[in-house]
């Protein structure tokens, strides 16, 4: 894990950074960059929801099914009993929330990369603060890329956990009209809060998001850095490659965390008044394994992997194109 790669977006900033001479100018450049990261991440998150919601609804229905079922059966029953628009049940909350979550993921990831850039430079006693932007401290070991993504995942979990729980509970409602337990996102929030369950599933979310996003950003940044190593600037990398890199990164994320995501979904969909699974990762794992074996941890795996490529390809491509539109070199 000692191999180093050029930090994407940091290398392409070098020309601009060479022109910065005063502390105020450096602070202004840093603030502008943070705002761009947040805005581009928000738009990327919206694209993620629009592309991925139908896949996600199917996945959650499979994960939380109490009897054995198949993807085709879920799709057939959902369309027959609830209509095509049922694929977008619970979409309002993630549409608003996932944009914020993705902006946090990207924003924290970029902030951590700059932290490690300065930290690595500080270990060189012969390097002045003016040299930092031009030295090999602009490259990071793979382990630091992982920590950057992991930190973004853990921080983001405090937003993602309640948002995902609301979406899961709305997605798994099969009743219509007055028989529904939750009338919508706000009603769901009020009832979860009243039961003290709004943050249920936070710990498994933190583990999943931390390791998952560590892998996610590590894979993507390494692939982009390889392209930069061939002599291209970040803005010269073809959009189709950025989309492909994002798709591959998302696939690797889910390969590493999927069983835990199943456990998390079950905990977050458990009965609020009489929880069956005691809000315990180990209890859920033992219970579902005893009932269905190892296959219980891979319910909905097919739709998730099919979803992963287009969703994450769209997320990273949108982020990169927005950054280019904003004039980020």
UniProtKB/Swiss-Prot annotation:
It comes from the Eukaryota. SUPFAM superfamilies: Mitochondrial carrier. InterPro entries: Mitochondrial_Carrier (IPR050567), Mitochondrial_sb/sol_carrier (IPR018108), Mt_carrier_dom_sf (IPR023395). Residues 1-33 form a transit peptide. One of its GO terms (cellular component) is mitochondrial inner membrane. One of its GO terms (molecular function) is glycine transmembrane transporter activity. Pfam families: Mito_carr (PF00153). It is found in: Mitochondrion inner membrane. Residues 1-27 are annotated as: Disordered. The chain crosses the membrane at residues 38-58, 84-104, 140-160, 205-225, 243-263, 297-318. Solcar repeats lie at residues 34-115, 143-226, 238-325. Keywords: Membrane, Mitochondrion, Mitochondrion inner membrane, Repeat, Transit peptide, Transmembrane, Transmembrane helix, Transport. GO terms for biological process: mitochondrial L-ornithine transmembrane transport; mitochondrial transport; transmembrane transport. It is a multi-pass membrane protein. Its main location: mitochondrion. Present with 1050 molecules/cell in log phase SD medium. Belongs to the mitochondrial carrier (TC 2.A.29) family. This is Carrier protein YMC2, mitochondrial. It comes from Saccharomyces cerevisiae (strain ATCC 204508 / S288c) (Baker's yeast).
């Amino acid at each position: 894990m000692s191999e180093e790669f050029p930090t994407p977006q940091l290398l392409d900033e070098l020309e601009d950074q060479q022109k910065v001479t005063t502390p105020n100018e450096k602070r202004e450049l840093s603030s502008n960059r943070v705002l761009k990261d947040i805005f581009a991440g928000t738009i990327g998150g919206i694209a993620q929801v629009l592309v991925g919601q139908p896949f996600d609804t199917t996945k959650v229905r499979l994960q939380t099914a109490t009897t054995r079922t198949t993807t085709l059966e879920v799709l057939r029953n959902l369309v027959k009993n609830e209509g095509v628009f049922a694929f977008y049940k619970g979409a309002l909350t993630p549409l608003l929330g996932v944009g914020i979550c993705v902006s946090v993921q990207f924003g924290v990831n970029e902030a951590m990369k700059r932290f490690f850039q300065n930290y690595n430079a500080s270990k060189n006693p012969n390097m002045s603060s003016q040299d930092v932007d031009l030295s090999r401290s602009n490259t990071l070991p793979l382990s630091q890329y992982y920590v950057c993504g992991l930190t973004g995942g853990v921080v983001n979990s405090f937003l993602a956990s309640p948002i995902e729980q609301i979406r899961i509970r709305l997605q798994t409602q099969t009743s219509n009209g007055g028989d529904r337990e939750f009338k919508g996102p706000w009603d769901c929030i009020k009832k979860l809060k009243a039961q003290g369950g709004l943050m249920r599933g936070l710990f498994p979310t933190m583990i999943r998001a931390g390791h998952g996003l560590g892998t996610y950003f590590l894979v993507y940044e390494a692939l982009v850095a390889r392209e930069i190593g061939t002599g291209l600037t970040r803005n010269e990398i073809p959009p189709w490659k950025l989309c492909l890199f994002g798709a591959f990164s998302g696939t690797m994320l889910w390969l590493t965390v999927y069983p835990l995501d199943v456990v998390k979904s079950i905990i977050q969909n458990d009965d609020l008044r009489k929880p069956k699974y005691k809000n315990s990762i180990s209890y859920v794992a033992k219970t579902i394994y005893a009932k269905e074996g190892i296959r219980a941890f891979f319910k909905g795996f097919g739709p998730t992997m099919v979803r992963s490529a287009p969703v994450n390809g769209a997320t990273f491509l949108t982020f990169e194109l927005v950054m280019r539109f904003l004039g980020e070199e």
